Amino acid sequence: MRQAKFNDGWRRTQELSNYNCQLRQVSINDAKGVSDKFCLELDNGISVLCGKNGVGKSTILKSIYSCIKKNGLVNNRLNLSDINISLKNNNHEVQDINNAVVNYLEPSVECNKIIRFLNDSDNINDFIEGIEPSGFLGKKENIAIIGNIIGRVYSKIEFYEVEGALDDDYTFPFIKVTLPDGVEYSCLEMGSGEYLCMYIFWFINWIEKNSILLIDEIENCISVYSQEYLMDYLAHVSSQRGIWILLSSHSETILSKVGIKNARLISNVSNVGISVVSPKHERKYFTALGIKPRKKGIFIVEDKFSYMFLKGMLNRAASDIAYDYH
């Protein structure tokens, strides 16, 4: 997939007309352990929640899912009556949010569950007997895209959608690949990152169009290289299929891809509770994650007096610039 097509995907995520179902606001009131002023506002097809471990990112995602879905499949510690969600459809407020289609995904958890189930099964061939591999996902273009994401060349990839084997209402992909030298193997022999990337690729194409997708810690087991290409692909499919994505992440690569404008910083102070802010400068969320932002450049001055003058002026008028440059 060409880089220009990737970049167009990111541009299109900014065009809200591409999304029929938009998660625009989440407010939480009078909930124990949550700030009284908690209000998460979103205005892009892909947004990211960032913050240190244990501050409440997963709690927020699970609360959103449970509030819309109301099926009890995802454990949630907040009282749903304290949560107010605003969805928009074609620029109009959705009156019954329970009609929206929402999916919650912890990729590493799902993949581990699937592989563990397959390893414990006596005859795996029984699961895929009579099932034809997906013609769409097995196209040459998609094989090339998956290869770019993972950093490996494949000559053939087969996705078998197995339904009702692991659970009554559960579908997962059993995947077989062939390399250019003729070597064949399945998801049981894949590295965790390889199967995880293919699983996310399958999932984003399997779920309904014009739905909401909540992804918790997408970067687990995935290399920095693959994170970059995977996010580009998600942006492309998100804008093409109208899938509104909110994810949580600690990854500098993913935060940089999504951009500071679409990042929301989650914190949890003992006397305040879970809070959310929209950082205006990248150093605020990088520092909150324990990541030291790279300097953008260097100012060269003539002498110490010039250095002191410039430093004082920047600290007074533009502290962010002073922080960004040596």
Residue ranges and their predicted role:
Residues 14-61:
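Pre-Walker A-like glycine/lysine-rich segment at the N-terminus of P-loop NTPase domains
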Residues 248-250:
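H-loop/switch region of ABC-family ATPase nucleotide-binding domains
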Residues 67, 190-215, 228:
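GG-anchored amphipathic helix commonly corresponding to the ABC/SMC/Rad50 NBD signature/C-loop
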